[in-house]
UniProtKB/Swiss-Prot annotation:
Gene3D superfamilies: 3.40.50.2300, GPCR, family 3, nine cysteines domain (2.10.50.30). It is found in: Cell membrane. One of its GO terms (molecular function) is group II metabotropic glutamate receptor activity. This is Probable metabotropic glutamate receptor mgl-1. The gene is mgl-1. Its main location: membrane. Keywords: Cell membrane, G-protein coupled receptor, Glycoprotein, Membrane, Receptor, Transducer, Transmembrane, Transmembrane helix. It holds the Pfam family ANF_receptor. Residues 975-999 are annotated as: Disordered. GO terms for cellular component: plasma membrane.
Amino acid sequence: MDKKWSLEQRWLHLLNQQFLDCLNHLFNHYRRLSTFQKPPSIIRHMFSVLALAIQILANVNVVAQTTEAVDLAPPPKVRQIRIPGDILIGGVFPVHSKSLNGDEPCGEIAETRGVHRVEAMLYALDQINSQNDFLRGYKLGALILDSCSNPAYALNQSLDFVRDMIGSSEASDYVCLDGSDPNLKKQSQKKNVAAVVGGSYSSVSVQLANLLRLFRIAQVSPASTNADLSDKNRFEYFARTVPSDDYQAMAMVEIAVKFKWSYVSLVYSADEYGELGADAFKKEARKKGICIALEERIQNKKESFTESINNLVQKLQPEKNVGATVVVLFVGTEYIPDILRYTAERMKLTSGAKKRIIWLASESWDRNNDKYTAGDNRLAAQGAIVLMLASQKVPSFEEYFMSLHPGTEAFERNKWLRELWQVKYKCEFDTPPGSTASRCEDIKQSTEGFNADDKVQFVIDAVYAIAHGLQSMKQAICPDDAIENHWISRYSKQPEICHAMQNIDGSDFYQNYLLKVNFTGKTISIFSSFRLSPFSDIVGKRFRFSPQGDGPASYTILTYKPKSMDKKRRMTDDESSPSDYVEIGHWSENNLTIYEKNLWWDPDHTPVSVCSLPCKIGFRKQLIKDEQCCWACSKCEDYEYLINETHCVGCEQGWWPTKDRKGCFDLSLSQLKYMRWRSMYSLVPTILAVFGIIATLFVIVVYVIYNETPVVKASGRELSYILLISMIMCYCMTFVLLSKPSAIVCAIKRTGIGFAFSCLYSAMFVKTNRIFRIFSTRSAQRPRFISPISQVVMTAMLAGVQLIGSLIWLSVVPPGWRHHYPTRDQVVLTCNVPDHHFLYSLAYDGFLIVLCTTYAVKTRKVPENFNETKFIGFSMYTTCVVWLSWIFFFFGTGSDFQIQTSSLCISISMSANVALACIFSPKLWIILFEKHKNVRKQEGESMLNKSSRSLGNCSSRLCANSIDEPNQYTALLTDSTRRRSSRKTSQPTSTSSAHDTFL
């Protein structure tokens, strides 16, 4: 027997898919044929029988794949409940859980997911049937089946929905002359199923939809969220009052993004719900940059179930699954308690232990299931974040359910209530007298601790949608039909309904009526081309089907936060709130709202679930093996910004990264650098220049006061004033150099410095050149161009060369400013010529310095009274040292414009200071402190003799004009002395050209 059954299994596995494809092809051909004429009834019967046979084969195939049993176990005692009515609505609910024992198809009775949903459907039918004007006298009945949470068993049970259709007499053997079907009275009492509410599990709904689509029966699920069920090419008669898992996956991903959980583990069950939900989550996670650290599949077979959970918990250990503290759950309801139990045991969780795992669970998490939080399970479940389809409680239903009591009609019509009572209250029905067993008839329900199933509202919405679709269809195709007005209904126990409503075309009903149901506020409206039919919604919730037949996408986000383990909640929560689940947010149509005050963690201490911590500002991610969520941090260069998390790019010249390193800003707008007056680099040169100007002005004042004294005259007043003015010009250049660069400032800088130096050193050169010519001449004639006017003209001509050259330079390169970039992070406002061009301007001044130094060296041996050249020489030597030092200092600190500018200012001032001190300080000393040397002497014989000896080397031609042209030196002598000296010697004392050699 075993061997034979195995062969059949293999044969059916090979042929089942071909049969289903063939059947679909035949039915499509039948639909096209029926458009023109009705085929004989025998053909339609053959199609129906073939469809039934193929579904049985499919059922056997599914059973063979999901169980190892050879024979199907006997079904439970109560297979279905039937409520009479004019139009039947089917129902498929998981009244029993799935058995993990392969020998039995059904497990324990499920109160919330099973019995509550069955009663919700019956309650909705009662509400609709109680309104006499709704279907104008038609009553809705029900045929409700138990799926036992098993797809194969549910498919087998669902054949009852199509048996009535196969055995009905609507396929008449008679055809009217015009080719239409005859309108015959039905002889059979069997009723066709107009639509089916169910199933709950997606795997059950898929199998059910595959069967019902062959017979064009509409299906409305109140709980199945499988994304594939939205595919109208495969499930053209399927609708649901809940959203697709695609939306749930989007909500879960947005929660992870909200809390910055970029590295999570994913656990899913080996069924359509788990696998499709996991695929949807992975798809959305990739879009948001969330990585899957661990992906584990939970096997649903008994022998491999425990092993897969053990492996899962082992892999979730913190030392093995580093970083991923968040675990996303897409598993069946029945698997979660075992996962929690094994987690608590293997990880040795205690009430005071730090939470290691945060569950992010789909709506399959049953908050009303006590097994989830029994014993140590609550330690593992604490802090879990659970998505629940946004639903509202139905107080009238809860009141109705609490009124159910053995012996009442409402109780006895649902045979599964007896089983629930026996299991829940440990009692027995119909106990014999004297029995010690508790009597179920005496037990009444208590409202304490009662929580209706979360999907009661969706079951009621599904029944309402079907009912109002039927109402709209009846108004369209049987507008004048009313049972209470039909004469047969007055005398017949089987009232006759509209013929078009007896055999409903599922395709027409689904497309034109069911999908157009729209719940608005407290009313339900069916929009069609005929009428608007209002009806009160039992929960006042807006509802409508999407074009794919899905319900509104809205989720409530809960967290498991038991009072017994949460001191804060015990202090703040109302004692009347018994639930251990706290609402922490809501998600609807891509809109996530989180109530942070209800979270079990502080908003500033959100749990971390990442592979790598975020890089600091200025660091880029260096991905590890192309893993999007795992990286090492690498520092960017100071001048680089991040175009994304993994690439640094340098800013353009003159730009610098912002503080957040997300872009660059223009340095010239906020950090433009130029000499500031408050800077130490400006204060020192300014002070030096001010003191130099004051000292120079003091010398000028002294010279003006003592302008007619011998010392002032002997120093050469004209050139002395030129020298002093040139020094003031040098000092003033400091203020020009320290000013903010502009066209005018740059023009003065390019001309003023060179011109000031040219005036200074031209005058010195004229002085030393004249002395050299005087003492080096061998002729008796007086040297040319040694008069004061000649000296001034020569000085002006020499300085004019520099001025003309500077003006030509300005015309060739107009003055202006520019941005200079000494380093990547600096922008300096400077003049629009390079530094080496500035040296070209000073080259001429350097040439004058060299000439002055040369003549100073040549005239170093002149007589003592003509030793002013010694001071000029000392001034030139010092100036050369200053300028050589400045050149190396200036170009050696090319990256610091402040040092360059400050050193240039100091060098210019020092050049003027050296000239001022060396040339004028000896004269000032005599004028101010040795005044006896600055007067005319009446008796100057001794001086005359001394002078005569000093002038022994003068040529006779040079001294010939001494009587006619008195000079500064002879001004110190009296007229008589001068005459005596003139008579006594054949040579003149001196010429006017030697006036500045006195000192």
